[in-house]
C-alpha cells in the first residue's frame, strides 16, 4: 500500500479535475489509483475524436476494464450514442456513474459491475460495437494476468466489432513490449489491421518507449459486398 500525504494546505475529497472540458472526480490521497490515469489522455482524445467524426446516429462503444469510466465520458462528450462500461469493481463503477452525472451524459451510458470473463453472453448480446476499448491491469491477482488473459480478449474482438470497427488495446506493463500485443493479434485476430500506436502525452515523455504505456489501434476490415453484374461483370 502507498500512502499519500499533503505537504501543505488541504484538498477536498473527492476533488474534481478537468481534462479537455470533461470533469472527473479524483481521490488524490488514495494511494496510486486516484481515479484518473493522466497518461491515458491521448487515448481519451482519440476516442472523443472518433465519436465526433462518426457519421449517422453516433458510435456504440464497449469499454472493458472501465475503472471510473473516463473513456465513456470522453466518448459521450464527443457524440457517441451508447457506451457499455464493464468492470468488476462496484466502487469504481459507482465513481464512474458520478463522473457521468458531473458531465450530464448519463443518458447514453450503461454500467455492468461484473467479471468480464463471466459475462461474455451479456456483452456479446449488447453488440456489435463500433469501438471496443481494452484497458486491463497488467496484473490483478485472481482476475487478470496480461501474459495469459489478454489473448482471451483478442480472439473475441472480430465478433464484437462491426465491419470497419476499431479496437483500442492498452497495456501498461514495462516488462511487455509492443510486440507482445502485435504478435498475438496476428495469431488470434489475423484479419484485423494495425493502424497506429498513439503517442503518450508530453508530460509523460518516454525514457524507454517499450517500457512505457502502449496504446494500439486496430481496425476490423470493411464488409466486402459481392460485385453487381450490372456494373460490368463478364462480357
Q: Predicted segments — roles?
A:
Residues 89-131:
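S-adenosyl-L-methionine
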Residues 68-80:
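Conserved SAM-binding loop of SAM-dependent methyltransferases across substrates and taxa
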Residues 136-137, 143, 170-174:
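Short strand-turn motif at the edge of the Rossmann-like AdoMet-binding core
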Residues 57-67:
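Conserved class I S-adenosyl-L-methionine
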Residues 1-37, 45:
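Non-catalytic substrate-recognition/targeting regions of SAM-dependent transferases
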Residues 82-87:
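Conserved SAM-binding motif I beta-strand of class I
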Residues 150-163:
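A short glycine-rich, Lys/Arg-flanked "PGG" loop and its adjoining helix->strand segment in the class I
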Amino acid at each position: 500500500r502507498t500512502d499519500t500525504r499533503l505537504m501543505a494546505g488541504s484538498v477536498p475529497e473527492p476533488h474534481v479535475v478537468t481534462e479537455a472540458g470533461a470533469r472527473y472526480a479524483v481521490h488524490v490521497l488514495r494511494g496510486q489509483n486516484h481515479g484518473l490515469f493522466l497518461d491515458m489522455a491521448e487515448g481519451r482524445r482519440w476516442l472523443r475524436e472518433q465519436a465526433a467524426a462518426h457519421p449517422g446516429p453516433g458510435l456504440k462503444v464497449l469499454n472493458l476494464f472501465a475503472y471510473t469510466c473516463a473513456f465513456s465520458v470522453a466518448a459521450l462528450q464527443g457524440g457517441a450514442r451508447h457506451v457499455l462500461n464493464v468492470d468488476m469493481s462496484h466502487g469504481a463503477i459507482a465513481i464512474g456513474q458520478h463522473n457521468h452525472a458531473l458531465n450530464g451524459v448519463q443518458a447514453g451510458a450503461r454500467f455492468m459491475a461484473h467479471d468480464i470473463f463471466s459475462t461474455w453472453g451479456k456483452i456479446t448480446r449488447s453488440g456489435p460495437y463500433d469501438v471496443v476499448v481494452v484497458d486491463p491491469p497488467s496484473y490483478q491477482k485472481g482476475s487478470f494476468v496480461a501474459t495469459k488473459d489478454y489473448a482471451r480478449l483478442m480472439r473475441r474482438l472480430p465478433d464484437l466489432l462491426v465491419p470497419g470497427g476499431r479496437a483500442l488495446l492498452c497495456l501498461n506493463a514495462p516488462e511487455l513490449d509492443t510486440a507482445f500485443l502485435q504478435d498475438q493479434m496476428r495469431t488470434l485476430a489475423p484479419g484485423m489491421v494495425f493502424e497506429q500506436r498513439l503517442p503518450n502525452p508530453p508530460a509523460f515523455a518516454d525514457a524507454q518507449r517499450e517500457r512505457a504505456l502502449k496504446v494500439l489501434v486496430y481496425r476490423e476490415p470493411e464488409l466486402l459486398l459481392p460485385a453487381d453484374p450490372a456494373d460490368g461483370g463478364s462480357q
